């Protein structure tokens, strides 16, 4: 199961490597002017890579706020999903970008249906990557600290396994209990119980 924790990083690494169009290449430069030039040629703002990622997913993954704003201004789909079901909000969570997460939510992305095919939410990603500021923001926006993915693991479980004590503390403050030792292991349970405000 812990092998799945690395899956987010692998999926997003594949997304960046799977670029197949000039717009993906333009986003990869990080240069807004280059992205504008490519869009001016008629490039599809929601074009897809082999893994079904969109330019907006890649911009969010790279924490490229100006490019994300440009793509959204051209009506990029803020809830587009790659082949694993990851959205731009997942990508922003992976990069730890509070500004891009705010932008996405302001333009229609939702936390209610943001889970990917395995039930992984942006909050889980932020917790795994130890992005405390982003996890705090997502919780304030209504992210569910008790949401379980398909194997029954919650955000706190995944944060415990990653050793992210600040995230575990944050999740406990928001009502997440330590999972039972039978679920996460004696050592992990003891660590969780030791974490206090």
Which residue ranges define each predicted feature?
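N-terminal segments that cap or nucleate solenoid repeat domains
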Residues: 19-54, 58
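Ankyrin repeat boundary/linker residues
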Residues: 49, 82, 115-116, 149, ...
């Amino acid at each position: 199961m812990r092998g799945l924790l690395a899956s987010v990083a692998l999926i997003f690494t594949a997304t960046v490597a799977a670029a197949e169009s000039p717009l993906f290449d333009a986003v990869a430069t990080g240069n807004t002017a280059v992205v504008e030039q490519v869009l001016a040629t008629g490039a599809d703002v929601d074009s897809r890579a082999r893994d079904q990622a969109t330019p907006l997913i890649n911009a969010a993954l790279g924490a490229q706020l100006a490019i994300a704003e440009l793509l959204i201004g051209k009506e990029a789909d803020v809830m587009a999903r790659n082949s694993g079901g990851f959205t731009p909000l997942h990508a922003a969570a992976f990069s730890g970008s509070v500004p891009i997460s705010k932008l996405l939510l302001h333009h229609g992305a939702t936390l209610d249906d943001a889970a990917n095919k395995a039930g992984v939410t942006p909050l889980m990603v932020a917790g795994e990557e130890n992005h405390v500021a982003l996890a705090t923001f997502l919780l304030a926006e209504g992210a569910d600290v008790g949401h379980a993915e398909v194997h029954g693991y919650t955000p706190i479980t995944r944060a415990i396994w990653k050793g992210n004590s600040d995230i575990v503390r944050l999740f406990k403050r928001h009502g997440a209990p330590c999972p039972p030792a039978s679920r996460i292991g004696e050592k992990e349970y003891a660590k969780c119980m030791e974490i206090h405000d």
